[in-house]
């Protein structure tokens, strides 16, 4: 640090003596002069961290540990050790012929050709030597992977042969790839191997791997495929059972549903046709014609359908065919009949109305109350008398 607190600024980089002994500096330029740019190659173990960009021919010098070594002697020493070579061939106007035979004219450019060689074995390299690939020298031929064998355009056939005793439908099949034989190379496919398991002698199975023609390949045991048709048949049966649907054209299915829901259909039928039965039984509905000049009661069919559908009372399916109906119009007529009976007695009119309303005298007092609810049990006898039927014969 300077006295004024600012860092010191050097006009030139430190000297070579301040660098580590494992670093090598390469200078480029004419007559070993220091150029404007320099590149440092640092060797950390066996790996190169940086590589020079420009190398000029006849101007190559290396400084390592403050010692200059001639280029030819350096290349000779590296050639003797079997290391990497860096061959610099550059010229301002030089033609370089490529591998394809095309001549490329390169001007004002420098080209660096790096020739890397592979050294088998562990190399104890010096500072500037880099070991790229290390192979073990004790590699057996059997340890080579089959994927690395170059078979060319030949096809690889996988053949198998099963020999021995097959018992309980169990056998071991070993598949081996048959590679074509390469020139000047031993055929590794012509070998036989037998495998025996820890079983008794009578159940021993021998599996032999060999190359056989495709026509002689034995078929697979049929026992392994006997279950496949059975599974297919079972699946088809399940599909036929599951795929059951009631079609609209199937009359038997509709008839079955009708029989099971007969009670419901009868009840609905009675509900929809109760108005028509009320028309047939005109005695059930008694209406008063207020517009009549004589003021007498008349049998009328006016507004019968709406009243029957609104106030009809339906019982069980069996009893509904007798149509136990108590229309609300009867209740209103009973109240009106009680008042008209007194008026008729004063005016000396016909006595037909009291005769008709006598069977309903028991219900007229009950209907006068405002909280009245229709109860078929209290008026059951009167309704049967109105229908002219005996209740004991039809009750269940």
Curated annotation (Swiss-Prot):
One of its GO terms (biological process) is flagellated sperm motility. Residues 1-21, 276-296, 336-396 are annotated as: Disordered. Its main location: cytoplasm. GO terms for molecular function: calcium ion binding. Residues 283-293 have a biased composition (Acidic residues). Disulfide bonds: none annotated. One of its GO terms (cellular component) is mitochondrial inner membrane. Transmembrane segments: none annotated. The modification Phosphothreonine is found at residue 288. The keyword Calcium applies. Keywords: Calcium, Cell projection, Cilium, Cytoplasm, Cytoplasmic vesicle, Flagellum, Membrane, Mitochondrion, Mitochondrion inner membrane, Phosphoprotein. Calcium-binding protein. Essential for maintaining the structural integrity of the sperm flagella. This is Calcium-binding and spermatid-specific protein 1. It comes from Macaca fascicularis (Crab-eating macaque). The gene is CABS1.
